[in-house]
Amino acid sequence: MKYKTNSLLVHLARAGDEDACEKLVKKYYSSIYQYCLLHIYDPYEAEDLTQEVFTCFFSNLYRYKEYGKVKNYLYTIAGNTVKNYYKKKKDIPSEELLKSEYSSKNHVEELGVRLTIEQAVRKLPEEIRETAVLYFFQELKQREIAELLHIKLSLVKYRIGRAKELLMKELEVKNYDEI
């Protein structure tokens, strides 16, 4: 049902239906924003890039082939947008901590743990990091990652396993479940 719904939304968006465009943005905005944030580390820049992703998506909607998933197409655009961002900037991403509006101690602790994990993920080699972000943070299935990155499923499994090993070493834990 999801696939047909997305297909219908894309068809309506191509026809100029603003409501369909809005539904597509609402459906995927959070995931694409998180993806950008995990690569850019700046919430304002990530928001700008997310908007750029959707602008690109809608301006090139006529090129979209409906045999793939909308989500994967958006992640592809997001990946290219992030790469272009760094090509223009030519800076190494800063290790600034994200500012949070959370005030309770629990939220601060959770944010601290998440930031520690994110910093460890940033240290992974690029190919492994990309796979890890899609798997652990975006919660894509291994098969979806393989399709998105145009690699074999066995390579995705290897990269996820390698990411777990490297993260355990970086975070100094003995079992991945401790993370």
Residue ranges of predicted features:
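Internal acidic/polar
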Residues: 3-6, 84, 91-122, 141
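Sigma70-family region 2
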Residues: 14-15, 54-69, 88-89
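Arg/Lys-rich amphipathic alpha helix in sigma70-family domain 2
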Residues: 62-66, 76-95
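DNA-recognition helix of helix-turn-helix
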Residues: 83, 128, 143, 149-174
